[in-house]
A protein has these predicted regions:
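Short substrate-entry loop that stabilizes the transition state in hydrolases
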Residues: 502-507, 512-552
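Hydrophobic beta-strand positions that form the internal "hydrophobic ladder"
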Residues: 59-62, 112-116, 162-165, 212, ...
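Non-catalytic accessory segments flanking enzyme active sites
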Residues: 54, 212-216, 222-224, 238-246, ...
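Short loop/turn segments that connect beta-strands within beta-propeller blades
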Residues: 85-88, 137-141, 181-186, 250-254, ...
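Mature N-terminal segment immediately following signal peptide/propeptide cleavage
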Residues: 33-74
């Protein structure tokens, strides 16, 4: 009989057996039977990521970045790769080999003879992250540096007419635009295009290459800048800041600039330009200091349309607390569209619809599209004839590619994959790129020749294979399931069975609760906080899409409004009972875990039942009254909890607070939070830990450095995952010794012997 190992022991043993070439009886019996090994948390840290896919102007080649993690050093290293779009993944070539440095943001020259990119390969040690601009040929050879910007290059873009590359550089809040002629890159000296006193915050080319539009603050507070330079780094909440305006820079001639928005009525954001360069769409944010520069600033903005020739401004929306999407122009530049709530006047969680109008129909009402679809309708990209809009949308436990016929107002899913599928199109070349992930396939990029062929998997061509090591993992079977909740509501979710699952045998259960709550668990690879690692260790994992989740229609998403916690709790517990009734889960061995909203419901479970043997809660609330002021978002809390301010209805907030019921807590609970979390600040977790400590309930509080809602450091992500699983093993299965730092330190030592991920293309070189 084999004794299951602790989470760290599993990780270390797998690493050592691979490094030595020995794969004996140290793996679990289930993994031996499948001829593979279970997935570990170290494997999760080693997953490589594809980014910045960029087709060549002739549509024959694809440049992309491949990011390789080094979790022991808490960093990632990025190189550039090239693949033939017609030949597919077998033709992949690595173009850069910078080891400790990075190459990012590849962009093709318009004639396809070379490409440009950013890199810190020659950056000094005291400015290691500072990028410069480089040029390289796709057929190989050494890259050539084009810039020597003192402060580095922030970003760059090439004009569509192929004449110029423009980049942004300078000190923070003082960045300016510079240009180099493509025809003379060998000897060219950068020419300053702007000398704006407040710098350039964001910018983009007009498609006709005659103008550059940039956004910049109206003024600079020199005293505020001086105090920061003098290290008076006090953080002032909602400081007075200048609004930002839109400017036009003429590329040819004397390079004059012209201000297009003024008066302080709004602050410019999310600028888009029509393909004929005659129209500009933008979001105007509120000038109110308390409604701008905050996480939810978009809901206080409105959309505007500007005539690029005359400068005439048309306000398109006039509503409070509605966050429309940016404007998207049709390819023929005759119409525009944006997405927003079904009720375009009232804040809420109603399904998004698409609103369309001809540009010439100034002042006329929008045409609402997609009303009959019980899900969100959005604007991804238009068909070439401007008749159809394509977008990606969650449908039950999947993500699919969907079309909206603008003229006939019909919505139709184009794919029916038991997977996570999304599509994007390169606007210059029309190349279609599909991202695909399922229970056994990590995120992989494909292409298809025409949108009409998207529904036929056989017509897809694979372009990337960033994580071939996944094929060696013993993975649990993943499937979508449904069950009936306490009130008869049909609820869905994802079930991950243990590796080597045998019908009729009961397994320890982990309930992995997603955040949001306006989100959903889908049939992608290794979702649910590492569900495949738990499956490899002998657990069955339930990832419930409880009420409040997306993908299952408007009613399920909004059923928690005014009664936030109870319906979702009922759904989760009914799912647990369903698995027990099916003979899959052992009701005597159950644990629950979650982050953010998943932490909220973990805390509610803690204070409403003792059926679970262990809980691990991350960034969860305890007291909605105090969280309202502590958090960086307020309006959605108010909406969910009855649509009143807490000061007008304390009971509505308190009745939904786990702290009110804390004396019911009996379950050993591990707590995780980032110290500077802005969304669910750490005092919520500290409050829970103190209460459990005083009530005599076993508890551990892990506080991670950082100022983000998620754990930023890969090393600490690893610690969180391993300590969490050790907590489950100890209390749910009665195994192991909880968490030991010595094991983590040993893992760091053993990682040096662990072979790096090698793709087939790497091996060929």
């Amino acid at each position: 009989m084999l004794v299951p190992l602790s989470p760290l022991a599993r990780t270390v043993v797998v690493a050592l057996t691979i490094a030595s070439g020995w794969t004996g009886v140290t793996l679990t019996l289930r993994a031996q039977q499948s001829g593979s090994r279970p997935m570990t948390f170290l494997d999760m840290q080693q997953m490589r990521q594809v980014g910045s896919p960029t087709p060549s102007p002739d549509g024959r080649w694809l440049l992309y970045t491949l990011s390789t993690p080094d979790w022991t050093e808490a960093k990632r290293q990025t190189d550039l790769y090239l693949v033939s779009i017609q030949q597919g993944v077998a033709s992949t070539r690595q173009l850069t080999f910078s080891k400790e440095k990075n190459e990012t943001s590849p962009r093709w020259a318009r004639d396809g003879s070379s490409f440009l990119f950013l890199s810190n390969r020659e950056a000094p040690e005291n400015a290691a992250s500072r990028n410069q601009l480089y040029q390289m040929r796709p057929d190989g050879g050494e890259a050539r540096r084009l810039t020597d910007a003192k402060e580095g290059v922030s970003d760059f873009s090439l004009s569509r007419d192929g004449r110029w590359v423009v980049y942004r550089s300078g000190k923070s809040d003082e960045e300016q635009l510079y240009r180099l002629p493509i025809a003379g890159l060998d000897t060219a000296v950068a020419e300053a295009m702007t000398k704006h006193p407040t710098g350039v915050r964001s910018w983009q080319w007009a498609p006709d290459s005659k103008r550059i539009y940039f956004v910049t603050p109206d003024s600079v507070d020199l005293d505020d800048k001086a105090r920061r330079d003098k290290k008076f780094t006090i953080n002032i909440r909602n400081p007075e800041t200048p609004v930002a305006s839109l400017w036009a820079l003429e590329v040819d001639g004397p390079q004059t600039t012209k201000r297009l928005t003024e008066g302080g009525a709004f602050s410019v954001d999310d600028v888009t330009v029509s393909s004929d360069s005659k129209w500009i769409g933008l979001r105007g944010l509120s000038p109110d200091r308390y409604k701008r520069g905050i996480t939810s600033e978009n809901i206080y903005g409105d959309l505007y349309l500007i005539d690029a020739t005359t400068g005439a401004v048309e306000r398109l929306t006039t509503n409070a607390e509605i966050g429309e999407s940016p404007i998207s122009f049709s390819p023929d530049s005759k119409s525009f569209a944006f997405s927003g709530p079904d009720d375009l006047q009232t804040y809420g969680m109603s399904n998004n619809r698409v609103y369309v109008r001809a540009i010439a129909d100034r002042g006329k009402p929008f045409q609402k599209r997609g009303e009959t679809f019980d899900g969100d309708v959005s604007v991804g990209f238009w068909s070439k004839d401007s008749a159809t809009i394509y977008f990606n949308e969650g449908i039950r436990a999947t993500n699919q590619i969907v079309s909206l016929d603008v003229r006939y107002n019909t919505v139709r899913p184009l794919t029916e994959e038991k997977a996570a599928v999304s599509i994007d199109r390169d606007e210059d070349t029309g190349v279609l790129l599909i991202d695909y992930s399922d229970g056994t396939t990590a995120s992989t990029l494909f292409t298809v020749d025409a949108i009409a062929n998207v529904s036929t998997r056989a017509s897809w061509r694979q372009l990337t294979d960033p994580n071939p090591q996944v094929r060696a993992f013993a993975l649990g079977q993943q499937e979508e399931i449904t069950w009936r909740s306490k009130d008869g509501t049909t609820v869905g979710g994802v079930l991950v069975k243990p590796v080597g699952y045998r019908a009729g045998q009961r397994y320890p259960l982990i309930v992995a609760i997603h955040g949001g709550p306006a989100s959903a668990d889908i049939l992608s690879f290794n979702g649910g906080y590492g569900s495949q690692v738990y499956a490899g260790a002998g657990y069955v994992v339930l990832r419930p899409n409880y009420r409040g989740s997306t993908n299952y229609g408007h009613k399920l998403k909004t059923d928690i409004v005014g009664n936030y916690m109870a319906p979702g709790y009922d759904d989760i517990m009914a799912g647990v009972d369903h698995l027990s009734a099916q003979g899959i889960a052992d009701p005597a061995r159950m644990g629950a875990l979650g982050w953010s909203a998943g932490g909220h419901w973990s805390n509610w479970i803690l204070t409403h039942t003792d059926r679970f043997k262990a809980i691990s809660t991350g960034a969860g609330t305890m007291n909605w009254i105090s969280l309202y002021a502590q958090s960086d978002v307020q309006r959605n809390r108010q909406y969910y909890l009855g649509n009143k301010l807490p000061y007008d209805d304390f009971d509505a907030y308190w009745n939904q607070s786990p702290l009110k019921y804390i004396k019911n807590a009996k379950t050993p609970t591990m707590i995780h939070v980032v110290e500077g979390d802005p969304r669910v600040p750490s005092p919520q977790s500290i409050e829970l830990h103190m209460a459990l400590k005083q009530l005599g309930v076993p508890s551990e509080l892990y506080m991670y450095p950082g100022n983000t809602h998620g754990i930023p450091d890969p090393r600490n992500q690893f610690v969180k995952s391993v300590s969490e699983m050790a907590w489950m093993d100890f209390y749910v299965r009665g195994q192991g010794t909880k968490f030991a730092w010595r094991d983590v330190l040993k893992t760091l030592e053993d990682e040096a012997a662990r072979p790096k991920v090698v793709t087939e293309q790497d091996a060929k070189r």
